[in-house]
């Protein structure tokens, strides 16, 4: 797999895809997978491959597990950056998109990649899912902390979301407005 971590583990006693498949909502398999991946990050390719599963539940739970794992271990993002960028650009599944939006600002992006990722996140604002929109708005704000040239466009998007967005988007917009006002530069 392009842009993965380590080699495929020879231990087959745990199947990541099966752990994420077909469980009731209250037992999604994500905590079990997280525990395995934290103990053996070399197996992360198994989790990344689940993003390509034919089962939307597995894709959703894989994205959830990746987002949670890389929040704790951001160093694991670098080897899978290309895969995540491709998945973020190609996925239409809302559950995958909102987790991708949360991960994108944490990727080790080059200055040339930041505008492309910002544009992708901006397109997420047109998603039917309000959760995707909220995560995208937050992600664009987070990207603007890395690239000051995005601060003006982010301020405009945040202000617009406060005026015209769904209630959850307006609430996130208000939170970001307060951060914009408190910020050292006053984004």
Regions picked out by a protein language model, each given a short descriptive name:
Residues 2-187:
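Alpha-helical scaffold domains
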